[in-house]
Amino acid sequence: MQPESGANGTVIAEFILLGLLEAPGLQPVVFVLFLFAYLVTVGGNLSILAAVLVEPKLHSPMYFFLGNLSVLDVGCISVTVPSMLSRLLSRKRAVPCGACLTQLFFFHLFVGVDCFLLTAMAYDRFLAICRPLTYSTRMSQTVQRMLVAASWACAFTNALTHTVAMSTLNFCGPNEVNHFYCDLPQLFQLSCSSTQLNELLLFAVGFIMAGTPMALIVISYIHVAAAVLRIRSVEGRKKAFSTCGSHLTVVAMFYGSGIFNYMRLGSTKLSDKDKAVGIFNTVINPMVNPIIYRFRNPEVQSAIWRMLTGRRSLA
């Protein structure tokens, strides 16, 4: 990100994040709501992570991935919300260019890992339901760790690519970002150099990072649905759909908000709808994920309850 001298000769070395609302009287309300959402998200995801670590019944591939997903949700919301809360308290909206790039990198890192991890979870469900005889071999601990490591490596490459590409753009004014965190669409609109290459890169990498995993998820669940429909036991079908239903809900929310946010860069003006989608990406998704997995999964519910009450598992 290369700051340049603007028309008045000043050098742009920082961005002004306008936040969610301009009305000063509503800032305390925004602060309380987002602080509450942050605490609920961190508490909910850490409770699932703790349950996965200490509960023997949850020492399986599906819950291994769920524990990793909880870490990602905490990371995703921690990249954006604490800094926003700090600005609300200090009433200082200026963010240095370097800090903006750092936030951009880590946000896309966590979101990218999330993308691949959801695919790994779909593959796990496919093996468990469609290939039960070879499940333990194909989804061994080594395979699980390799899938997680590959997810981090691919996401790191993606985040670094966008961050480096963004750093090559020139910014000579204005420097007001109509958002509460630094992200690609908003920064593209402030650049005084061409962003065509950056947007093409976003679409190309986005197809690889989102399109391919989404296709793999759809294919996996087509096979899963066909296998579940062949199960004669009503209880067996119910159990299969309960574990898959939670994951499908999270996938729909994650990809739905992501596609809306990044696949409409041709818009000449970003509106408050983009802020709403930003809230969905950074706050709502990480907050509701543990709720979805907890309330739609009896094993997670009982594990968290035993952990809170100090009871030991019978396993």
From Swiss-Prot:
Disulfide bond positions: C100-C192
Q: Cite the Pfam families for this sequence.
A: 7tm_4 (PF13853)
> Per its record, what are the GO molecular function terms?
G protein-coupled receptor activity; odorant binding; olfactory receptor activity
Gene3D superfamilies referenced in this protein's UniProt entry, alphabetically: Rhodopsin 7-helix transmembrane proteins
Q: Does the keyword Transmembrane helix apply?
A: yes
Q: Where are the transmembrane segments?
A: 29-52, 61-82, 104-123, 144-161, 200-223, 241-264, 276-295
Q: Which domain of life is it from?
A: Eukaryota
Glycan-linked positions: N8
Where does the protein end up?
Cell membrane
Physiological role: Odorant receptor.
- Under what name is this protein listed? Olfactory receptor 3A1
Gene of this entry: OR3A1
